[in-house]
């Protein structure tokens, strides 16, 4: 009986170690989006604002860096929306929802995403876009479609 317990213990330890190793060695997938106010629909965003979003997915963690130029106003929220180019769509993943520092040009952080969200974005990144909202542009100051990089 004690040999059985030892064998079971060794198996459990081996499986746990392998599971932890696979989580820590999870491959990352990177997506980018060239952003501008002109891409916002149905109303245009901030005409002079441009930017670039980089989204890195590792497991269920989604990390973002959004660099914006000439943004008028304080970033209030950032999202990934579902929607093809030229179409507005609902929020799919909230990146941030609290105001950032005034005129902050680099927005970054990490959020959790569900397996189904990650799978959907990975399957067809062009069906999703990143946008940043300000008080002046509550529907979005700038936007860019995702693409795998």
Enumerate the predicted regions with their spans.
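Metal-centered catalytic cores of metalloenzymes
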Residues: 2-78, 82-149
């Amino acid at each position: 009986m004690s040999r059985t317990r030892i064998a079971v213990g060794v198996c459990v330890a081996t499986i746990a170690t392998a599971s932890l190793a696979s989580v820590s060695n999870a491959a990352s997938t990177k997506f980018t989006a060239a952003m501008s106010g002109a891409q916002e629909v149905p109303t245009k965003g901030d005409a002079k604002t441009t930017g670039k979003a980089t989204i890195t997915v590792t497991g269920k963690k989604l990390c973002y860096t959004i660099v914006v130029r000439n943004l008028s106003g304080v970033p209030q929220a950032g999202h990934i929306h579902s929607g093809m180019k030229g179409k507005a769509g609902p929020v799919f993943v909230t990146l941030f929802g609290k105001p950032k520092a005034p005129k902050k040009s680099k927005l970054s952080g990490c959020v959790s995403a569900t397996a189904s969200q990650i799978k959907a974005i990975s399957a067809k990144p062009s069906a999703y876009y990143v946008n940043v909202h300000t008080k002046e542009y509550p529907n979005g100051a700038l936007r860019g479609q995702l693409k795998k990089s």
